[in-house]
């Protein structure tokens, strides 16, 4: 058998459910909360989501239930966007719930994300197949994709395929853009009088899909534990050799939740938080000044080494660079024909010629390799209009600018230390890992709970599990209307409904804890070494939650 010993042992793990979800479906009673409103742009969203806007928050409690179904279910499931640890356990939870409801129920997985739905490319997920993927990482059971469902033709195809397969519901496992797809599909089906339900599941290691009810998206726990182990290893390496500065870029397209969590777990000398950069309107030069200041002070202490954490999406939060990217984007969108068939050097000439004088200065002040990568990030925007920020090696940009600054200082006799930088990018290493105990339990519960929402006839909801700082048996299950998370944003020159990314709250406990400690972490070697994710052993270690959740849910 082509399977590791670890996988064999890990598949023996039985995920834990909230007590309410262990009950017979007829004894799970639905409780309606107050009707909801969107974050902003409420009138525009009311017009767009005429049938699904303003739904109430849902919770479940023990009591008599009036289920919407009595016969076997046919459910379609989609894995959308980048992988996150635990996706297979969401599917396992869905499978076990529908089979418990009626053993003749069927679960279909659409291959390659939303495109599989549009092309009716699917497989039936059988018990033997599901069992081989329980508690494993990745999205490879059916694979994922980033196709955006956004045209009338797409909606019609999705509806046709759903009816062709006699689907009662579709569950979309994904991030903000994927759950935007879910909200739009739910509205379209409802508008056309079709009784096909759509439920979303909050997935993203970035942790930017959340609100007061969605406490965290799945995958964040596992991924940050993996990155923190690696960063802790680099901290130990820095202490061992005392000659390297490790610059670590961490995945996280927009929000800095991953960087902040890893900083709280490892105590690096420097960690940039993108949201603070934006709030304080820091320039690129000011960020370099701050980093050089720490490097200089540590050098005076005899410490010519350290660890720096940089969030992947930082480049979009530096006001001058963000404005530059938007202007480059606008130039490309309005003059796309001029760029066809050109190499990158020729493209650069057109961009430079059309940039405003100020932005031209900003652009040309950047190292040449960054100038080219910015162009590539614009050319490679995903179907949702997001820049490919991972193309921009921000950590290398910082290294080059710091090196240049230190060389100048050395010539003036202001710096006598040594600076040997090493760059790293941690992202893909954590996306498809075996899920932690937390993510294994959380994901299984999210999937199981999604079925309970379906059995109660709900659509346009996101599966929600709360009180995540407690034992899984004490978690609270329910649902949050997808429209509650939305606003209107400009994509490719048009205002469109989109789930708003939840950024780091600069008034929140995690950031304040970081601010309280960062100055002493900068100059002292107070590194923590979290070690690898633990799957076996005492509950204190294997069931540990993130520092972010500990602080945010502190009573």
Curated annotation (Swiss-Prot):
Binding-site residues, Mg(2+): 176
Binding site for diphosphate: 82
Known regulation of activity: Non-allosteric.
Residue numbers marked as site, Important for catalytic activity and substrate specificity: 177
Coarse class of the protein's main subcellular location: cytoplasm
Any one of the GO BP annotations: fructose 6-phosphate metabolic process
Catalytic residues, chain numbering: 206 (proton acceptor)
Entry annotated with the keyword Cytoplasm: yes
Alphabetized UniProt keyword annotations: Cytoplasm, Glycolysis, Kinase, Magnesium, Metal-binding, Transferase
Cofactor(s) annotated in UniProt: Mg(2+)
Pathway where it operates: Carbohydrate degradation; glycolysis; D-glyceraldehyde 3-phosphate and glycerone phosphate from D-glucose: step 3/4
Residues annotated to bind substrate: 146, 204-206, 243-244, 251-253, 312, 428-431
Family: Belongs to the phosphofructokinase type A (PFKA) family. PPi-dependent PFK group II subfamily. Clade 'Long' sub-subfamily.
UniProt name for this protein: Pyrophosphate--fructose 6-phosphate 1-phosphotransferase
């Amino acid at each position: 058998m082509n399977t590791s010993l670890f996988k064999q042992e890990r598949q023996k793990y039985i995920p834990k459910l909230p007590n309410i979800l262990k009950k017979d479906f007829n004894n799970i009673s639905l409780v309606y909360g107050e009707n909801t409103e969107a974050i902003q742009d409420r009138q525009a969203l009311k017009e767009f989501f005429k049938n699904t806007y303003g739904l109430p928050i849902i919770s479940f409690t023990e009591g008599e239930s009036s289920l919407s179904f009595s016969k076997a279910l046919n459910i379609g499931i989609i894995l959308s966007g980048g992988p996150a640890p635990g996706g297979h356990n969401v599917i396992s939870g869905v499978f076990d719930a529908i089979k418990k409801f009626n053993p003749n129920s069927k679960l279909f997985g659409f291959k390659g994300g939303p495109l599989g739905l549009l092309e009716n490319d699917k497989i039936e997920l059988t018990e033997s197949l599901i069992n081989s993927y329980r508690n494993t990482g990745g999205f490879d059971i059916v694979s994922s994709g980033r196709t955006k469902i956004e045209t009338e033709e797409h909606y019609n195809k999705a509806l046709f395929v759903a009816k062709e397969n006699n689907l009662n519901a579709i569950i979309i496992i994904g991030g903000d853009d994927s759950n935007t797809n879910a909200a739009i599909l739910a509205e379209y089906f409802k508008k056309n009088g079709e009784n096909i339900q759509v439920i979303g599941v909050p997935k993203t290691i970035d942790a930017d899909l959340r609100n007061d009810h969605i406490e965290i998206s799945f995958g964040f726990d596992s991924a940050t534990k993996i990155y923190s182990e690696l960063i802790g290893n680099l901290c130990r390496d820095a202490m061992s050799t005392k000659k390297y500065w490790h610059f670590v870029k961490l995945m996280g397209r927009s929000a800095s939740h991953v960087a902040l969590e890893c900083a709280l777990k490892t105590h690096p000398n420097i960690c940039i938080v993108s949201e603070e950069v934006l709030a304080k309107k820091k320039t690129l030069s000011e960020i370099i000044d701050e980093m050089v200041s720490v490097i200089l002070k540590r050098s005076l202490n005899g410490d010519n080494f350290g660890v720096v954490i940089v969030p992947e999406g930082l480049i979009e939060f530096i006001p001058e660079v963000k404005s530059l990217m938007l202007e480059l984007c606008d130039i490309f969108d309005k003059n796309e024909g001029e760029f066809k068939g050109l190499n990158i050097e020729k493209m650069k000439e057109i961009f430079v010629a059309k940039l405003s004088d100020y932005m031209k200065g900003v652009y040309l002040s950047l190292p040449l390799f960054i100038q080219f990568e910015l162009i590539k990030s614009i050319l490679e925007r995903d179907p949702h209009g997001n820049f490919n920020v991972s193309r921009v090696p921000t950590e290398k940009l910082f290294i080059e600018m710091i090196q240049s600054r230190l060389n100048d200082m050395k010539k003036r006799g202001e710096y006598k230390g040594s600076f040997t930088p090493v760059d790293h990018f941690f992202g893909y290493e954590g996306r498809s890992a075996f899920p932690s105990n937390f993510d294994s339990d959380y994901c299984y519960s999210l999937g199981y709970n999604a079925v309970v929402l379906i059995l109660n006839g709900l659509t346009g909801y996101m599966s929600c599990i709360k009180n995540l700082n407690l034992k899984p048996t004490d978690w609270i299950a329910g649902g949050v209307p997808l429209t509650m998370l939305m606003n209107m944003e400009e994509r490719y020159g048009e205002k469109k409904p989109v789930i708003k990314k939840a950024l780091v709250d600069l008034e929140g406990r995690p950031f304040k804890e970081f601010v309280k400690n960062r100055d002493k972490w900068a100059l002292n070697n107070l590194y923590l070494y979290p070690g690898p994710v633990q799957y076996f052993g005492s509950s204190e270690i294997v069931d540990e939650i993130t520092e972010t959740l500990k602080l945010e849910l502190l009573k």
